[in-house]
Amino acid sequence: MLQYPQIDPVALRIGPLAIHWYGLMYLIGFALVYALGRRRITSGHTTSMTVRDLEDLIFYSVLGVVLGGRLGYVLFYKPAHYLANPLEIFYLWEGGMSFHGGLIGVIVVMLLFAHKKRLGFFTVSDFIAPLIPLGLAAGRLGNFINGELWGRPTDVPWAMVFPQSGDGLPRHPSQLYELGLEGIVLFALLWWYSSKPRAAGQVSAMFLMGYGAFRFLVEFTREPDNFLGLLAAGLSMGQWLSIPMVLAGAGLYLFTARPPSR
C-alpha cells in the first residue's frame, strides 16, 4: 500500500487571496491546449485557423466548460436536489462539475464559433480534439491533489488511503488511472492519428470513442457517487454517459469513412 501524499489544496497565498491547485490545474490545462494549438497553426498543420481564432475559441470554451460542466452535474447527477435548492446551482465553490456536461458546452461553443468564422464544424473539432486530453490530464491531477473522486476499495500494492473517504480503506488511485488513460495515452494516440490527413470528422470520432472507452473502463475502479450508487446493469452514471459517446464516435467514424457516392 502506498501513502497518499497529503498536499495542501492551496497552492499559493497572496494576502487574503488563496489560489487552489484545482483552479491552477484548469489554467495549466488551457495553457497547454493553447501552446500546442499555436504550434500546430504556426507549423502549417492547418491553414483554416489563425492564432487569433485559437485564442477566441479557447476563451469561449472556458465558458462552455464551466457552464456546461455545472449544468451537466445538476441535470445528470443531482436534479432533485437542485430543483429543491435552485440557488445552489450557482455555488460553484462547493464543487460539482460533469465532464460530459462540459463536453456538450464545448460542442455548442464550437458550433457557434464555426458558424461565425464560416468554417466547417469538423474543421474546428478535428483541430481541437487532440489537444483536449491535456486539459483532462491536468484536471485529474487536480482531483488527486484534492484527494477527491477516489477509487473503490482494493488490495493492489499501489492502493492508497484517502483521508477524505473517512473509512481508512485502501483504494484505487482512480484519478491517476484517468490522468494516464484519458489524458496522456489518449493525447498520444490522437496526436499521432491527426498527424496525417484524415477525412473530416474522423479525428473527432476517435476522440469520442477513445475517451468514452477509457472512461467506461476506469469507472470499474472508481467509487460511485454516494448519492447515486450503481445504476441499471451495475453500471455507474459515468459509464452510462460514456456509452453514447462510444456509439456516436463509432457511427461518425463509419459515416465519414464511406467512399464518396458517384
From Swiss-Prot:
Recorded family membership: Belongs to the Lgt family.
Primary role: Catalyzes the transfer of the diacylglyceryl group from phosphatidylglycerol to the sulfhydryl group of the N-terminal cysteine of a prolipoprotein, the first step in the formation of mature lipoproteins.
Pathway annotation: Protein modification; lipoprotein biosynthesis (diacylglyceryl transfer)
Keywords annotated in UniProt: Cell inner membrane, Cell membrane, Membrane, Transferase, Transmembrane, Transmembrane helix
InterPro entries cross-referenced by the UniProt entry: Lgt
Annotated compartments: Cell inner membrane
Stored HAMAP family: Lgt
Name of this protein: Phosphatidylglycerol--prolipoprotein diacylglyceryl transferase
GO-annotated cellular components: plasma membrane
